Amino acid sequence: MNINDILKKLINKSDLEIDEAEELAKAIIRGEVPEILVSAILVALRMKGESKNEIVGFARAMRELAIKIDVPNAIDTAGTGGDGLGTVNVSTASAILLSLINPVAKHGNRAVSGKSGSADVLEALGYNIIVPPERAKELVHKTNFVFLFSQYYHPAMKNVANVRKTLGIRTIFNILGPLTNPANAKYQLMGVFSKDHLDLLSKSAYELDFNKVILVHGEPGIDEVSPIGKTFMKIVSKRGIEEVKFDVTDFGISSIPIDKLIVNSAEDSAIKIVRAFLGKDEHVAEFIKINTAVALFALDKVSDFKEGYEYAKYLIENSVNKLNEIISLNGDLTKLKTIMVKSSG
């Protein structure tokens, strides 16, 4: 593969085929392409607009080069991040609830643009985010939950870290996280930072051997199920791609004030989650339940979203014990107790 020819093709706004994109991504991730060319390629892709084939090719390369573990029937709640609203880390809270009934392989990283990525909030709760593969399998067996820290499970990505940091713009790698779970999770609730990317990412997901993925983008521009209004969804399954629009009131609840969901730090996010689990923060609890409801539908545990919401009400009642179990087997209970004390007021 001639990298300069690939670059010329991208500059001319021609899309790469899947195989071309996969080969290119492998060369970049392995550190075989000079940084100046890597930056040129990433910018050219962004300016052209990443195609479905390019996303699929890059995702396949990242999956192949990842440290892998096997977690049958797992669900992930990883989204793209990057909506910039700074809301409580609801995907992590939902993952904890889901682990009461199904294996969860939560793929994630530190915050991109928000105040609290999955890794940040789990650390604040006392969780040890560096989990080697054998230990990960053991934790799933014992607790139904494991966090797969992206930087640990995709070690070759260090070869592009400097370029990405120097560029300081969104690149194709920012949207690959939820498509590259190291446990090859077959089910997913995937928040998407932009409504415009729903179609592109759903078509990409369809090519990547998922059983069922629900991609969501909610009003007012949030990469979660909307707490205030409409959520735009793409439901991807073996049968194809279905487009759905759903309003928060369709759960049978009122809209949730967005300002009640904003956090200032990872610790703040952890406290809000624990308060919701304890029944002390109704707004955050509702936000967790509506997102969990859609994830339950992705797992085919319920027949519709409203039934999922009713199921989530039951799950959140058992969430504190589950969180204690998860941290006690892989973390620092002292940290969790500190958060519990701060949450009890």
From Swiss-Prot:
It catalyses: N-(5-phospho-beta-D-ribosyl)anthranilate + diphosphate = 5-phospho-alpha-D-ribose 1-diphosphate + anthranilate. Its cofactor is Mg(2+). The keyword Transmembrane does not apply. GO terms for molecular function: anthranilate phosphoribosyltransferase activity; magnesium ion binding. Binds 2 magnesium ions per monomer. Mg(2+) 2 binds at residues 223-224. It comes from the Archaea. Pfam families: Glycos_trans_3N, Glycos_transf_3. Anthranilate 2 binds at residue 164. Pathway: Amino-acid biosynthesis; L-tryptophan biosynthesis; L-tryptophan from chorismate: step 2/5. Keywords: Amino-acid biosynthesis, Aromatic amino acid biosynthesis, Glycosyltransferase, Magnesium, Metal-binding, Transferase, Tryptophan biosynthesis. One of its GO terms (biological process) is L-tryptophan biosynthetic process. One of its GO terms (cellular component) is cytosol. SUPFAM superfamilies: Nucleoside phosphorylase/phosphoribosyltransferase catalytic domain (SSF52418), Nucleoside phosphorylase/phosphoribosyltransferase N-terminal domain (SSF47648). Mg(2+) 1 binds at residues 91, 224. Its EC number is 2.4.2.18. Catalyzes the transfer of the phosphoribosyl group of 5-phosphorylribose-1-pyrophosphate (PRPP) to anthranilate to yield N-(5'-phosphoribosyl)-anthranilate (PRA). Homodimer. This is Anthranilate phosphoribosyltransferase.
